[in-house]
C-alpha cells in the first residue's frame, strides 16, 4: 500500500520534468525528487524505486543537457541520491553512455 503512495508522489514531478520548459519549475521538481530520494529510510528507498519504475531516470539524464546551471545542479544531485540504489546506478550509467 505505501509503495503505491510513492508512485503517486513521483508521477507529478516526472510529468513536470518531461513536459515543462520553465527553469524554475524544473529546478523545483528536480529538487523535490532530490529531497525525497535522500537518506536510507524506507520511503526514500521506495521513492528511488518508483522513479526507476516510472521511467524517470532517462528524463533526468536528458535534463543534464540544459544550459541552466541551477537546473543541472538540482538534476545532478537528484541523480546522485537516486544512485544510492544499485540498480538505478547501473541504469544511470547505461542511459548516459547510450546518449
What is each stretch, according to the model?
Residues 41-45, 84-85:
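Short, solvent-exposed loop/turn at the beta-strand->alpha-helix junction
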Residues 12-15, 59-61, 98-99:
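Buried hydrophobic core positions in alpha-solenoid tandem helical repeats
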Residues 1-8, 20-38, 50-54, 65-84, ...:
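Alpha-helical solenoid repeats of the armadillo/HEAT superfamily
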Residues 9-10, 43-44, 56:
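N-terminal alpha-helical segment
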Residues 14, 45-46:
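Leucine-rich repeat
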Amino acid at each position: 500500500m505505501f509503495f503505491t503512495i510513492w508512485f503517486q508522489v513521483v508521477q507529478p514531478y516526472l510529468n513536470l520534468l518531461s513536459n515543462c520548459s520553465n527553469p524554475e519549475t524544473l529546478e523545483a521538481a528536480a529538487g523535490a525528487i532530490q529531497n525525497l530520494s535522500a537518506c536510507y529510510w524506507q520511503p526514500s528507498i521506495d521513492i528511488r524505486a518508483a522513479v526507476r519504475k516510472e521511467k524517470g531516470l532517462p528524463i533526468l539524464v536528458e535534463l543534464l543537457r540544459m544550459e541552466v546551471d541551477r537546473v543541472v545542479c538540482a538534476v545532478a544531485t537528484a541523480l546522485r541520491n537516486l544512485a544510492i540504489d544499485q540498480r538505478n546506478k547501473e541504469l544511470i550509467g547505461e542511459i548516459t553512455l547510450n546518449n
